[in-house]
Amino acid sequence: MSLDLTQFVRNIPDFPIPGVQFKDITPLLGNAQAFDAAIEHFAQRYANQQLQAIVGIESRGFIFGAPLALRLGIGFVPIRKPGKLPAQTIGVDYSLEYGTNRLEIHNDALQAGDRVVVVDDLLATGGTVVAACDLLNQLGAEVVEAAFLIELTFLGGREKLGNRPFYAQIQY
């Protein structure tokens, strides 16, 4: 019998601003059985995909991406905010509702043709994961799928992803 992970996602009304229903995953992370179930679910999905790496988007993508990579026996590659990686990087700028942001990756993190899954905790508007996929394409990596614990369907992230494959364990 599989565990209902929605029981471990807490809804926080009016956080961080009035009108927002924040999905708090800390109860899931704090429960070893639930956290393991989430990682195992991803691992079963990607076990036979001939992946070279799991790529995690800063910061909560690291929480799910690193243990998934270990479970699959492959490497973990971080995509970070600007100025956080010590070696030579490539980056991509992307638009937010008010302004822009930037993601970076080490320029030697992957080889052309490497098959990867991009992991983050939540798919909202899709801007960050689209930028991450664009960054990986610059390195010549093949993004097999973008994986999320949660998708907030009402924010239109799946439309922003277009034809890029993605998967979410929980949808709201």
UniProtKB/Swiss-Prot annotation:
Annotated EC: 2.4.2.7
Family matches, as InterPro entries: Ade_phspho_trans (IPR005764), PRibTrfase_dom (IPR000836), PRTase-like (IPR029057), UPRTase/APRTase (IPR050054)
GO cellular component: cytoplasm
GO process terms (BP): adenine salvage; AMP salvage; purine ribonucleoside salvage
Cellular compartment(s): Cytoplasm
Keyword tRNA processing among record annotations: no
Pfam families: Pribosyltran
NCBIfam families per the UniProt record, alphabetical: apt, PRK02304.1-3, PRK02304.1-5
Family annotation (HAMAP family): Aden_phosphoribosyltr
Protein family (similarity comment): Belongs to the purine/pyrimidine phosphoribosyltransferase family.
Function statement: Catalyzes a salvage reaction resulting in the formation of AMP, that is energically less costly than de novo synthesis.
Quaternary assembly: Homodimer.
Listed name of the protein: Adenine phosphoribosyltransferase
